[in-house]
Amino acid sequence: MADDVQLESSVRFTQTGPQTIVLEKDLDTEYMIVNMGPQHPSTHGVLRVELLTDGEVVVKATAHLGYLHRCFEKHAEYVDYPGIVPYVDRMDYLASMNNDFAYCVAVEKLLGIEIPRRIEFMRVIVAELNRIASHLVAIGTYAIDLGAFTPFLFCFRDREHLLNLLEWICGARMLYNYIWVGGVSHDFPAKFEERVMEFVRYFKPQARELYQLLTENEIFVQRTKDIGLLPADVAINAGASGPMLRGSGVKWDLRRDDPYSIYPELEFDVAVPDGKASVIGDCLSRHLVRAIEIDESLKMIEQCIDMMPKDPNFDPHAAVPKRVKPKAGEVYARGEAPRGELGFYIISDGKGTTPFRCKARSSCFVNLSLLPEMAKGQYIADVVAIIGSVDIVLGEVDR
């Protein structure tokens, strides 16, 4: 028999030795399209991901957006500057304090308002409390996406303490409308600082336990380690920020690298993975960054409580303008939200009390654009882990 005898166009007999004959057939495979969402628990909102697959391997991933589009930027052209704050609340509804913080900094920059020092500390305290609450949702829901139920219960148990604190100062558990242009809606209640310090002391060991639950659970590590790799250069070129960028080993945090408010006075470390428990740039790295950031936020809250000026006659509305009508001009201000850089570009024509243009720079939208890069070549089951590691909020993506 010849060494290679062609029987059909796709079937061959190959003699590899005196006794061995191997039948080979080239299988013709077809790509299949798998739709994840828009009603899918792992997408954490109305997101549809179209997966082009070869068997169980993803060849291409395409995110379809717009299911939660509410015309925020167009509405902002017909609402006065203070009235936009409730709209901003509803973008990333898990981190409303940070949304309001960034927006109010932009308007105050446009107006040239100087904020009282106590208010600056109050804003940072509530923003960092909200950051911890947001990260607890991210970590807890991510764990349950991958089948780990216990961390989910731990995270939401401790998040209740934070929501109770935030409810105490503004009456709402979500969509706070607490940070105003030029100030805040209310001063802290009596003994609020003491309650915050009690929470910090209680939660420090809980945060360490949460970190161990993530790094010492073999199944969780196997589902996230070396999955959805995002190289640092790709993340930088795409404009990624927050835990997405820091998870790829890039030490970039606006609170340190483009500081605002009183962040330059605070001592904290930029959270990046060390590469021991995870592979730099994978799903596990991004989630470890969030766990580490919780510790750093606790440090900042402690410092703010110690450094904040005490004034029994403090007026939280002292710098709040009665009428916001800025001169013609434009401004861009940004802040470090839990999911990355949240910026507002505002144009005033100087003619009225509404902005000519209010553009929001969404960290979630930019980070989600990297999904095709991370999902390519991965299994369908791992796409769940990848989407969860991005930690998107569709209210901010679609706006």
Curated annotation (Swiss-Prot):
Keyword DNA damage recorded: no
Keywords assigned by UniProt, alphabetized: Cell inner membrane, Cell membrane, Membrane, NAD, Quinone, Translocase, Transport
Pfam entry (one): Complex1_49kDa
Known catalytic reactions: a quinone + NADH + 5 H(+)(in) = a quinol + NAD(+) + 4 H(+)(out)
Broadest EC class assigned to this enzyme: translocase
Location of the protein in the cell: Cell inner membrane
Membrane association type: Peripheral membrane protein
GO molecular function term, any single one: quinone binding
One GO cellular component term: plasma membrane
EC number: 7.1.1.-
Lineage top rank: taxon: Bacteria
Subunit composition and interactions: NDH-1 is composed of 14 different subunits. Subunits NuoB, C, D, E, F, and G constitute the peripheral sector of the complex.
Function: NDH-1 shuttles electrons from NADH, via FMN and iron-sulfur (Fe-S) centers, to quinones in the respiratory chain. The immediate electron acceptor for the enzyme in this species is believed to be a menaquinone. Couples the redox reaction to proton translocation (for every two electrons transferred, four hydrogen ions are translocated across the cytoplasmic membrane), and thus conserves the redox energy in a proton gradient.
Stored HAMAP family: NDH1_NuoD
Assigned protein family: Belongs to the complex I 49 kDa subunit family.
The name this protein goes by in its record: NADH-quinone oxidoreductase subunit D 2
Taxonomic source organism: Chloroherpeton thalassium (strain ATCC 35110 / GB-78)
